[in-house]
């Protein structure tokens, strides 16, 4: 399945340019290999480990017609599932890049640096919208909105539903796919350290909530975080788009800081006051994480990612505002010089920098 338009002049096989242009096709072939494995008895079990959720347990459930339901815990086989859906994320990334963002970049006629920023903001906007809608559906279906106590407890405490586990698997797969995308998108070397920290903080936060079974709390914090990040990405798209909409970006700092404060307040109140509950003697082997170490880990992950992202985005927007201010000042100086050079459409002979008139020689 071709996702990239091939150039008239094909680069050498396995060269850097060849890998960048055809990485979606190659990843599609790898993913198809796991799908075709379902057709054969000898490889179907291995393929199932990559394509479906593992470590399921059937538990009794009152009120259901079957009298039971399947809950999940995490295990080593989850790495295979994360790997497969990481391949899916790479394919979706390439599809959005070619059929949406590349066309938008050509229409706006942006420079190479602005194209990279536009591509990043566009990809993240799609991811945040899909994750936000998906996460809100899960919170509503598991009664987290009507029963806030589920944010720090769940029964049983070492299990999760299918949709909850699949959400976390997909989140981990997306952020892991960001590592090879640094190569495929030709990210500048000076930007790679910041990108690695940004991706690592997300993986630390999501992985911590997944491994500590703080599923509902982690999901709510992600929804708050993604809402603010979506606003930042939309502001970036407007910044590179029509100038008529750039005046509305003045509301961005207020909403951004407010969203970060709400996220920190929810983290501190929920984790600091209610996570431990009445039983403070947790058993990590059984999945009970009501211990001080778990609280410190959750609070540190939440605070660290909020502080880092706030500092990074604030710095970026300050640089943009300074650039716009400098351009505005330079433009105003040019206009003032042009006005001084002419008065009512006639050149002013008294200007200091005007060339002296040549004297006419007598015949």
Curated annotation (Swiss-Prot):
Residues 51-80, 142-159, 215-218, 272-295 are lumenal. It is a multi-pass membrane protein. It is found in: Endoplasmic reticulum membrane. Residues 1-29, 102-120, 180-191, 242-250, 317-363 are cytoplasmic. Residues 338-363 are annotated as: Disordered. One of its GO terms (biological process) is SRP-dependent cotranslational protein targeting to membrane, translocation. Residues 354-363 have a biased composition (Basic and acidic residues). Residues 116-324 form the TLC domain. It holds the Pfam family TRAM_LAG1_CLN8. PROSITE patterns: TLC. It comes from the Eukaryota. InterPro entries: TLC-dom, Translocation_assoc_membrane. Keywords: Endoplasmic reticulum, Membrane, Protein transport, Translocation, Transmembrane, Transmembrane helix, Transport. The chain crosses the membrane at residues 30-50, 81-101, 121-141, 160-179, 192-214, 219-241, 251-271, 296-316. GO terms for cellular component: endoplasmic reticulum membrane. Belongs to the TRAM family. Stimulatory or required for the translocation of secretory proteins across the ER membrane. This is Translocating chain-associated membrane protein 1-like 1. It comes from Mus musculus (Mouse). The lineage of its organism: Eukaryota, Metazoa, Chordata, Craniata, Vertebrata. The gene is Tram1l1.
